A protein has these predicted regions:
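Extended, non-globular alpha-helical segments
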Residues: 1-2, 75-87
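Conserved beta-strand-loop-alpha-helix hinge in the C-terminal portion
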Residues: 45-76
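Helical segment within the ABC ATPase nucleotide-binding domain
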Residues: 5-19
Length: 87
């Protein structure tokens, strides 16, 4: 369920940060990417190429659950959803 997904995401994030592991995560979930990532690369449809690159900057980087509570989180999500012609 969604609640467990959020908690698992937080656990993975903490492990990555504690062990200082560079990670490439592929997702179709814009909200997850905006909460989790330092950089988001948006791809086009086939043939795939890079459409845009976004550096995600929070005043204080926290875990994904707390990042979702920040006002800038919605700005990042809306910008990327707009690029994808969702909103």
């Amino acid at each position: 369920d969604y609640q467990n997904r959020l908690l698992n995401s937080n656990d993975v994030y903490k492990i990555i940060k504690e062990k200082n592991i560079t990670t490439l995560m592929v997702t179709h979930d814009v909200s997850e990417a905006c909460a989790f990532a330092d950089i988001i690369i948006v791809l086009t449809d086939r043939p795939t190429h890079v459409k845009s690159i976004h550096k995600i900057i929070y005043d204080k980087k926290e875990d994904p659950i707390n990042n979702r509570l920040k006002p800038i989180y919605n700005i990042y999500c809306n910008k990327i959803l707009g690029e994808l012609n969702v909103i």
